[in-house]
Amino acid sequence: MKFRRMISEIMDFRNLSEDEAYSLMEMIMAGELDDIKIAAILTALAMKGETVDEITGFARAMRDRSPRVRVSGSHEVVDSCGTGGDSFRSYNISTAAAMIAAAAGVRVAKHGNRAVTGSCGGADILEAAGVNIELDAAAAARSLSDVGISFMFAPLFHRATARVAAVRRSLGFKTVFNILGPLTSPAAAGIQLLGVFDPQLVGPVAEVLRNLGTRCAMVVHGFDANLNPALDEISTVGPTLVAFLEDDEIRIDRLMPPDFGVEVGELEHLRAGSTTAENLELFMDVLRGREDTPEQKSRLDIALANAGALIYLAGLADTLPEGTETAKRTVKSGAALELLEEFVSYTRNLQS
């Protein structure tokens, strides 16, 4: 039996080929493996350590089997999605950054889920703001075309995610599925800003994106002021480890907040609230451009730095600081808040 051979190889610390990993994910998605077998596979892979080829095969299978959000010029579409699971429970930075970048003219296909480590994930915050997050592929494509932004709720697009959800909860440790979410954009976005929970994943995940045909990307992990791993985002409180992917070449760099055009902030200022209502207020303050207190300024600056990177990747700015400056002008003009209001109205009128 194929499963028995694969689990035996993994338990012997032998790596699967990309094709074998693809086949294994197909078995999971087709419901051919029960929870015990899925748990065994995920545990064995975590103990061995997943390779670039294995992650590529898993991601390719999930992409091939999920509904496709078909948009013209998908190579110019940007996805902003992190793995979650980092060591600090920050407010929802990537969703604020996506909204700001979209208001600046970037076509953003935001792919996300509910909270992993924070108290409010991208789906949670947009739903609380009034967005209809349960759009099918056709509706998401219309939203991207008409509004300039769409949200694709991962469980609606990836049956494998739903299939293994209970197993992942019972295992209680990170598995390859923590990495796969951001790698499986239903819009096949050609441009990506992808945050990872572990700095050791920065280079390998960039290699996976290259294997999957991503045109250009930044894979990032943010550190705190004491150089401790902290954020699956660009950091404004310490260094950011970045893998730049462009023209099939990968370059690793370590950047500081001024390299993004922002001042060094305080990590504690970025902490999420304890309720969805509190997190919605933090999110709205950022889109309003509020910086009356040091806490508000830190939250705004990190959103601007991440939005600026999206603007830079999309080719709407020549440098990262220019991207951040464009993001700041966008927020101060009120355009980000206006786009959210339009996004809410549009998605509520769409029938999935």
Swiss-Prot record:
<feature type="binding site">
    <location>
        <position position="232"/>
    </location>
    <ligand>
        <name>Mg(2+) 2</name>
    </ligand>
</feature>
<feature type="binding site">
    <location>
        <position position="122"/>
    </location>
    <ligand>
        <name>5-phospho-alpha-D-ribose 1-diphosphate</name>
    </ligand>
</feature>
<comment type="subunit">
    <text>Homodimer.</text>
</comment>
<dbReference type="InterPro" id="IPR017459">
    <property type="entry name" value="Glycosyl_Trfase_fam3_N_dom"/>
</dbReference>
<feature type="binding site">
    <location>
        <position position="94"/>
    </location>
    <ligand>
        <name>Mg(2+) 1</name>
    </ligand>
</feature>
<protein>
    <recommendedName>
        <fullName>Anthranilate phosphoribosyltransferase</fullName>
        <ecNumber>2.4.2.18</ecNumber>
    </recommendedName>
</protein>
<feature type="binding site">
    <location>
        <position position="82"/>
    </location>
    <ligand>
        <name>anthranilate 1</name>
    </ligand>
</feature>
<dbReference type="Pfam" id="PF00591">
    <property type="entry name" value="Glycos_transf_3"/>
</dbReference>
<dbReference type="InterPro" id="IPR005940">
    <property type="entry name" value="Anthranilate_Pribosyl_Tfrase"/>
</dbReference>
<feature type="binding site">
    <location>
        <position position="233"/>
    </location>
    <ligand>
        <name>Mg(2+) 1</name>
    </ligand>
</feature>
<comment type="similarity">
    <text>Belongs to the anthranilate phosphoribosyltransferase family.</text>
</comment>
<keyword id="KW-0328">Glycosyltransferase</keyword>
<dbReference type="Pfam" id="PF02885">
    <property type="entry name" value="Glycos_trans_3N"/>
</dbReference>
<feature type="binding site">
    <location>
        <begin position="110"/>
        <end position="118"/>
    </location>
    <ligand>
        <name>5-phospho-alpha-D-ribose 1-diphosphate</name>
    </ligand>
</feature>
<comment type="function">
    <text>Catalyzes the transfer of the phosphoribosyl group of 5-phosphorylribose-1-pyrophosphate (PRPP) to anthranilate to yield N-(5'-phosphoribosyl)-anthranilate (PRA).</text>
</comment>
<comment type="pathway">
    <text>Amino-acid biosynthesis; L-tryptophan biosynthesis; L-tryptophan from chorismate: step 2/5.</text>
</comment>
<feature type="binding site">
    <location>
        <position position="90"/>
    </location>
    <ligand>
        <name>5-phospho-alpha-D-ribose 1-diphosphate</name>
    </ligand>
</feature>
<dbReference type="GO" id="GO:0005829">
    <property type="term" value="C:cytosol"/>
</dbReference>
<dbReference type="InterPro" id="IPR036320">
    <property type="entry name" value="Glycosyl_Trfase_fam3_N_dom_sf"/>
</dbReference>
<feature type="binding site">
    <location>
        <position position="168"/>
    </location>
    <ligand>
        <name>anthranilate 2</name>
    </ligand>
</feature>
<keyword id="KW-0479">Metal-binding</keyword>
<dbReference type="GO" id="GO:0004048">
    <property type="term" value="F:anthranilate phosphoribosyltransferase activity"/>
</dbReference>
<dbReference type="InterPro" id="IPR035902">
    <property type="entry name" value="Nuc_phospho_transferase"/>
</dbReference>
<feature type="binding site">
    <location>
        <begin position="85"/>
        <end position="86"/>
    </location>
    <ligand>
        <name>5-phospho-alpha-D-ribose 1-diphosphate</name>
    </ligand>
</feature>
<dbReference type="InterPro" id="IPR000312">
    <property type="entry name" value="Glycosyl_Trfase_fam3"/>
</dbReference>
<keyword id="KW-0460">Magnesium</keyword>
<dbReference type="GO" id="GO:0000287">
    <property type="term" value="F:magnesium ion binding"/>
</dbReference>
<keyword id="KW-0822">Tryptophan biosynthesis</keyword>
<keyword id="KW-0028">Amino-acid biosynthesis</keyword>
<dbReference type="GO" id="GO:0000162">
    <property type="term" value="P:L-tryptophan biosynthetic process"/>
</dbReference>
<feature type="binding site">
    <location>
        <begin position="92"/>
        <end position="95"/>
    </location>
    <ligand>
        <name>5-phospho-alpha-D-ribose 1-diphosphate</name>
    </ligand>
</feature>
<keyword id="KW-0808">Transferase</keyword>
<feature type="binding site">
    <location>
        <position position="233"/>
    </location>
    <ligand>
        <name>Mg(2+) 2</name>
    </ligand>
</feature>
<feature type="binding site">
    <location>
        <position position="113"/>
    </location>
    <ligand>
        <name>anthranilate 1</name>
    </ligand>
</feature>
<feature type="binding site">
    <location>
        <position position="82"/>
    </location>
    <ligand>
        <name>5-phospho-alpha-D-ribose 1-diphosphate</name>
    </ligand>
</feature>
<keyword id="KW-0057">Aromatic amino acid biosynthesis</keyword>
